[in-house]
């Protein structure tokens, strides 16, 4: 069944009129300045915490943050300053935490003799600890605080 041409035109006009207000509404923005092309001052960089104390993680599977300064560390295809302290054979000498065993696995889960190439560039996951305030409220609670056995111990 085909629609009469006049009805088709009327339906098209009604749809267009109804969609008009939807197109004129402002789209919600996630971030940025009120005027996207205007220049705004960059916020100050947060201060790096360099007290060498490890801190708890903020969410499950979070890579540990770096509790010391890394400015000037060489991290390239030819050199990785992080490995001078955190490689298995050196970590005991300098009291640095050893690299996780997961960093020695390739994509297929096979163990390698040295750090996997996909885990070689530490700062792809690990970042220096700073005094930056969270952008959103963190409601993460460690599993140990949620289990009945740990609640009885309190």
Curated annotation (Swiss-Prot):
Instruction: Please give the biological process terms from Gene Ontology that the record holds.
Output: anaerobic respiration
> Superkingdom of the source?
Bacteria
What keywords are annotated for this sequence in UniProt?
Electron transport, Heme, Iron, Metal-binding, Periplasm, Signal, Transport
Q: Which residues hold heme c 1?
A: 68, 82, 85-86
Q: Which GO terms describe its cellular component?
A: periplasmic space
Tell me the GO molecular function terms.
Answer: metal ion binding
Location of region: Disordered: 27-47
The listed locations are: Periplasm
Induction and repression of expression = Induced at high levels by nitrate under anoxic conditions in the dark. Induced by oxic conditions, even in the absence of nitrate. It is suggested that the extent of electron flux to nitrate or oxygen, under anoxic or oxic conditions, respectively, serves as the signal for induction.
Pfam families assigned to the protein according to its UniProt record, in alphabetical order: NapB
The family database entries (PROSITE patterns) matched by this protein are listed as: MULTIHEME_CYTC
Q: What InterPro entries would the database entry show?
A: Multihaem_cyt_sf, NapB
Modification after translation is described as:
Binds 2 heme C groups per subunit.
Function statement: Electron transfer subunit of the periplasmic nitrate reductase complex NapAB. Receives electrons from the membrane-anchored tetraheme c-type NapC protein and transfers these to NapA subunit, thus allowing electron flow between membrane and periplasm. Essential for periplasmic nitrate reduction with nitrate as the terminal electron acceptor.
> Mind telling me what this protein is named?
Periplasmic nitrate reductase, electron transfer subunit
Q: Which organism is it from?
A: Cereibacter sphaeroides
């Amino acid at each position: 069944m085909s629609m009469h041409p006049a009805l088709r035109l009327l339906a098209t006009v009604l749809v267009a009129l109804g969609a008009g207000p939807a197109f004129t509404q402002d789209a919600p923005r996630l971030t940025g300045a009120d005027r996207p092309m205007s220049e705004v001052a960059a916020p100050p960089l947060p201060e790096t915490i360099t007290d060498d104390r490890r801190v708890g993680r903020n969410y499950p599977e979070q890579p540990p943050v770096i509790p010391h300064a890394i400015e000037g560390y060489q991290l390239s295809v030819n050199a990785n300053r992080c490995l001078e302290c955190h490689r298995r054979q050196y970590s005991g000498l300098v009291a640095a935490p050893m690299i996780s065993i997961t960093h020695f696995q390739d994509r297929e889960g096979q163990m390698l003799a040295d750090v996997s190439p996909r885990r070689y560039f530490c700062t792809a996951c690990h970042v220096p600890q700073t005094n930056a305030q969270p952008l959103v409220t963190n409601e993460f609670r460690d599993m140990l605080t949620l289990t009945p056995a740990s609640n009885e111990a309190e």
